[in-house]
A protein has these predicted regions:
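C-terminal interaction-tip segments
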Residues: 1-40, 108-128
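Short, solvent-exposed loop/turn segments enriched in Ser/Thr/Gly
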Residues: 39-46, 99-101
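Short solvent-exposed strand-capping/beta-turn motif centered on an Asx-Ser/Thr pair
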Residues: 50-54
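Short acidic, Gly/Pro-enriched loop/turn segments at secondary-structure junctions
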Residues: 55-59
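Short acidic, glycine-rich loop/turn motifs
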Residues: 63-67, 108-110
């Protein structure tokens, strides 16, 4: 029988804190990693992004690959977030164990630090 547990994002928000997206298009911020080699463990990731700045920002999520992996670029999701707006940007994107460091990363299309903050949680599903 499968078990379900809710956890904070890891590695970025282990205490439930928000994760500020830093730098720009060439540097990714790790949002969540599925650090298991067990292929019966799935991470269902829920993320909300808030723009605390005064201008719109394009948030780019890279879903499902390792650091700088081509697979993640193929699964790129773009969101335009207006000032003082919060968007639900990951409605349960699911990543699976089987290789370590399968993750979700984020970056901004513009060079503005910490004006977009991500909060969220992970439902860990163990089917073993």
């Amino acid at each position: 029988m499968a078990t379900f547990t809710r956890e904070c994002l890891s590695p970025g928000a282990t205490q439930g804190n928000g994760i500020g997206i830093v730098v720009n298009g060439t540097t990714e911020t790790d949002i969540h990693e599925c650090n298991t080699a067990t292929d019966t463990i799935y991470h269902e990731v829920h993320l909300w992004a808030t723009n605390i700045g005064t201008s719109a920002h394009t948030l780019i999520l890279l879903v499902g690959g390792e650091d700088n992996a081509a697979a993640a670029v193929a699964q790129q999701k773009n969101f335009i977030i207006q000032p003082n707006e919060t968007l639900y940007v990951s409605p349960g994107f699911t990543i699976r164990g089987a290789s370590t460091h399968v993750e979700i990363q984020a970056k901004l299309a513009t060079n503005t630090n910490n004006e977009v903050v991500i909060h969220g949680h992970v439902n860990v599903i163990n089917q073993s």
